[in-house]
């Protein structure tokens, strides 16, 4: 799977309640949104950014493990940039490629996984988790 490039990223709070036809409730589940830009300097390393707009950027460093049991795994750490609104932020991401259906029609590559806030910031506690989906642009 090609990782280098741009991916549309969205994370969602893990709330088991159904939203029905309430669009505002559905929107309130979005934890974060932006664009992952990945580079792969080696087959096992990943660097890049998560740009959420408005100066909110995390610098990413990660590992790619294509030889683990099961699908390739991605373990990524996101660090806030000094002098920006993300100063002091730290998030961890764990993901793997979405299954590519052999008979899928117009399927776009995806990465699915989970995220945890590794350090508290802006009055929000560490340990908050969410699920994420990143879709190839």
Regions found by a protein language model. Give the residues of each.
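Short, solvent-exposed loop/hinge segments that bridge or flank secondary-structure elements
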Residues: 1-53, 119-132
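Predominantly extracellular/secreted and cell-surface proteins with exposed
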Residues: 29-86
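Beta-sheet ligand-binding and adhesion/scaffold domains
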Residues: 2-14, 63-137
